[in-house]
């Protein structure tokens, strides 16, 4: 009996100490996010340009709105995907579009850059399964 109580207590302790975001908000398996513009290999003249973001089989909502099958865009610039069970960082390499934007005008210095989209839930955590685009490369002149 005592062993059963200790086992149950340990199981409960593990359950209660696991972060709430460890299992992301569910997403449809056929959902995908993509770039409308720019396209892979695009050459951008001047540092400022529009990024237009698309999403299929899910909807866009602002941060803080906890509905099923919705999220908001995050643009990853010159970086790898962050840990997919944690909130997406907010810095110069991880731009948040928490108001539900589907396009943005950004500025990058001259050179080769990579861009990738990652959809986040109401808490900026990637969905489960995560919804992200292929990484594209652009050149800014």
Where are the regions that the model predicts?
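N-terminal signal peptide c-region/cleavage motif recognized by signal peptidases
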Residues: 17-19
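Short, compositionally biased P/S/T/A/G/V-rich stretches that sit at domain boundaries
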Residues: 23-46
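A glycine-anchored, Pro-Gly-centered beta-turn/N-cap motif
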Residues: 47, 109-111
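Short amphipathic, basic-aromatic surface patches that mediate peripheral association
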Residues: 54-65
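Short coil-to-beta strand junction motifs in C2/discoidin
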Residues: 65-73, 132
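Short acidic/polar inter-strand loop motif in beta-rich domains
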Residues: 82-84, 120-128
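Short beta-strand elements
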Residues: 129-141
């Amino acid at each position: 009996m005592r062993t059963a109580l200790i086992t149950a207590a340990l199981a409960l302790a593990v359950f209660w100490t696991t972060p709430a975001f460890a299992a992301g908000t569910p997403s449809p398996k056929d959902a995908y996010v993509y770039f409308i513009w720019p396209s892979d290999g695009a050459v951008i003249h001047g540092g400022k340009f529009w990024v237009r973001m698309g999403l299929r089989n899910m909807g866009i909502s602002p941060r803080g709105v906890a509905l099923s099958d919705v999220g908001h865009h995050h643009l990853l610039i010159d970086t790898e995907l962050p840990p997919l069970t944690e909130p997406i960082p907010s810095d110069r390499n991880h731009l948040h579009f928490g108001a539900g934007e589907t396009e943005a005008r950004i500025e990058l210095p001259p050179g080769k850059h990579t861009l990738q989209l990652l959809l986040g839930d109401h808490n900026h955590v990637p969905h489960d399964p995560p919804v992200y685009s292929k990484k594209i490369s652009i050149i800014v002149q």
